[in-house]
Swiss-Prot record:
Belongs to the DeoC/FbaB aldolase family. The gene is lsrF. The active site is at K203. Signal peptide: none annotated. Homodecamer. This is 3-hydroxy-5-phosphonooxypentane-2,4-dione thiolase. The keyword Cytoplasm applies. Induction: In the absence of AI-2, repressed by LsrR. Induced by AI-2, via release of the LsrR repressor. In the absence of glucose, induced by cAMP-CRP by direct binding to the upstream region of the lsr promoter. Gene3D superfamilies: Aldolase class I (3.20.20.70).
C-alpha cells in the first residue's frame, strides 16, 4: 500500500499558463493514434522530419545477392550508422542482435522469387509477429499495372487494416513491372493509389523529371529507393535532388552495401538527408571518410 503520511496538496498549477499541445507535423499523419505516431517518430527523426533507412531485405526474392552473402559480416557494421533497418523477420531473428537498438521496418510481402513473376506476392507476415518483434512498420510491394495488381493492392489493404488495430504503420513499396515506364505519371499514379488505400509511408523511385509533382500529389511521406548500384557521386546527387524536391528520406541498399566503402557512404548520405549538404560536399565527406 502507498505511504499516506505527509501528503501535501498541490499548489503550483500555473493557471496562467495553458497546457502545450505539441502538434505531430509529419506529413499527413497528424490524425493517427499515439502508438502509430510514436513508431513513426522513431522512423523519421523528429528534429529533421527525415530518415535514412538501410534496406537489406533483398534476399526474400533474390537470395544471397552480391553484398548480402553474409549479413553478419557485411551488413552488421552498418547498423549503427542507419536510422532504420529494413529486413525480413528471418534475418532479424537470426542475425540482428536485439541490443542493436535501431527501429525496424519488416518486409511483410513475399512468396515469390526472381525465377517467376515478381508481382505475384502474398502477405508473408502476421501483425502479431510484427508486434512481437517490436517493429516500427511493415512494408509490402504494390505493383500498379502488373498482372497481379489487384492482389498486391489487397495485400496493402490487409496490412493497413491489421496495422490500425495495433498502431503499426504500413509502408507501400512501388514495384515496377518489366514493361513499365519509370516516369512521373506512373509513380504519381502508384504512390497516390497506395496512399489512398491507407499506407502511412510510400517508398518509390526518384525520377529526374517531375519528382516534385509525385511528392506534391502524395499526402503522406515519400522515401526514395536506392535502386541499382550507381557510382557514389551519382547516388549522392540522386539523394540530394530527391530531398530538395520534397522527399522525406531514403531507403538505400545496393548503393550502400555494394559500395567500396559502405560506412563512408552511409555517413555521406546522412549528411545529405539530415544536414542539407550538397552532393559535392557529401562526396568530399565520402572521400575523406574512406581513407
Amino acid at each position: 500500500m502507498a505511504d499516506l503520511d505527509d501528503i501535501k496538496d498541490g499548489k503550483d498549477f500555473r493557471t496562467d499558463q495553458p497546457q502545450k499541445n505539441i502538434p505531430f507535423t509529419l506529413k499527413g499523419c497528424g490524425a493517427l493514434d499515439w502508438g502509430m505516431q510514436s513508431r513513426l517518430s522513431r522512423i523519421f527523426n523528429p528534429k529533421t522530419g527525415k530518415t535514412v533507412m538501410l534496406a537489406f531485405d533483398h534476399g526474400y526474392f533474390q537470395g544471397p545477392t552480391t553484398g548480402l552473402e553474409r549479413i553478419d559480416i557485411n551488413i552488421a557494421p552498418l547498423f549503427e550508422h542507419a536510422d532504420v533497418l529494413m529486413c525480413t523477420r528471418g534475418i532479424l531473428r537470426s542475425v540482428v542482435p536485439p541490443a542493436t537498438n535501431r527501429p525496424v521496418v519488416l518486409r511483410a510481402s513475399g512468396a515469390n522469387s526472381i525465377l517467376a513473376e515478381l508481382s505475384n506476392e502474398a502477405v508473408a507476415l502476421s501483425m502479431d509477429d510484427a508486434v512481437r518483434l517490436n517493429s516500427c512498420a511493415v512494408a509490402a510491394q504494390v505493383y500498379i499495372g502488373s498482372e497481379y495488381e489487384h492482389q498486391s493492392i489487397k495485400n496493402i489493404i490487409q496490412l493497413v487494416d491489421a496495422g490500425m488495430k495495433v498502431g503499426m504503420p504500413t509502408m507501400a513499396v512501388t514495384g515496377v513491372g518489366k514493361d513499365m515506364v519509370r516516369d512521373q505519371r506512373y509513380f504519381s499514379l502508384a504512390t497516390r493509389i497506395a496512399a489512398e488505400m491507407g499506407a502511412q509511408i510510400i517508398k518509390t523511385y526518384y525520377v529526374e523529371k517531375g519528382f516534385e509533382r509525385i511528392v506534391a500529389g502524395c499526402p503522406v511521406p515519400i522515401v526514395i529507393a536506392g535502386g541499382k548500384k550507381l557510382p557514389e557521386r551519382e547516388a549522392l546527387e540522386m539523394c540530394w535532388q530527391a530531398i530538395d524536391q520534397g522527399a522525406s528520406g531514403v531507403d538505400m541498399g545496393r548503393n550502400i552495401f555494394q559500395s567500396d566503402h559502405p560506412v563512408a557512404m552511409m555517413k555521406a548520405v546522412q549528411a545529405v538527408v539530415h544536414h542539407n549538404e550538397t552532393a559535392d560536399r557529401a562526396y568530399e565527406l565520402y572521400l575523406s571518410e574512406k581513407q
